[in-house]
Amino acid sequence: MCTTLFLFSLAMLWRRRFTNRVEPEPSRVDGTVVGSGSDTDLQSTGREKGPVK
């Protein structure tokens, strides 16, 4: 029984972690609509810096 409770608690923790990771993605989509230019600039800048180094 202790093992079952332990596994159940681990499953709940993993679900919470995955849920937290999934939630920001839709928020980024909403943010992308508002500041898509800023997000694109940051990504392109990061890509340019990589090859230069």
Curated annotation (Swiss-Prot):
Lipoprotein as UniProt keyword: yes
Region (Disordered): 24-53
Lipid group attachment sites (S-palmitoyl cysteine): 2
Main location: other
Localisation per UniProt entry: Cell projection, Cilium, Photoreceptor outer segment; Membrane; Endoplasmic reticulum; Golgi apparatus
GO CC annotation terms, alphabetical: cytoplasm; endoplasmic reticulum; extracellular region; Golgi apparatus; photoreceptor outer segment; photoreceptor outer segment membrane
Impact upon substituting residue 2 to Y: Loss of N-terminal lipidation. Fails to localize to the photoreceptor outer segment
Family label: Belongs to the PRCD family.
Subunit architecture: Interacts with RHO/rhodopsin; the interaction promotes PRCD stability.
Protein's recorded name: Photoreceptor disk component PRCD
Source organism: Mus musculus
Lineage: Eukaryota, Metazoa, Chordata, Craniata, Vertebrata
Gene: Prcd
